[in-house]
Amino acid sequence: MRGFTIIQNILTAIVIPFLALIIGLCSFSGIYIFFKIIGLFGISIDSFNEVDSVPLEDFVITGVALGMGITAWGVTLVIFSGLLGGLFRPRLEPGRYPLKSFVTIQWAWSMIFHKIALFFLPFLVPSFIGNTFYRLSGAKLGKGVQINSAHLNDAGSVTLGDGVVIGGKAIINAHLTEKGELVMAPVNIGKDALIGMGSVIQPGCVIGEGAIVASRAVVPKWT
């Protein structure tokens, strides 16, 4: 597509303030909790103008309030990013697409929300919050799935059967770029399969029930 680089640069310039907007909007919960906690203990922000005269317990309470606020912001950011990721996920047929095309732009736009979630998602896996993020993003997860990775990329094209365990820092990609093309294909992992720590699953892979993928192994596309 002619002029793709120019379009890419323009969209990048637009995306950066958009990211800032989402991050800022999701901070409302953290700000509320922070001021609510310090208010319950009668602490005034103005008192820190004379920091040397502030009682030690006020520092402790303020620190706890700050930690709770940051955590609330992070959880809100992850859930909201999951909602947007699911809403805007591309409905693309498996196949190869020119890298310099509107399909690539559509796919890249959907991945933005996962990148935003990565501010806090690594601290929330494995947990029901992490699983909720992936479900909201479009992943099909069976019962008892344990995901200890923040890198289930293209979640809308990933299916995990009951009891699947995804090891720490494993990467599951339903996309690949090669030779000027964007390769898209769903990934299906069968019931009770184990994906080892640090392994890489490429697009189009079908992992059978009860299969074990060794740590740091690479499963090539369409395996």
Locate predicted features:
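Terminal amphipathic alpha-helical/low-complexity segments used for targeting or macromolecular assembly
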Residues: M1-R135
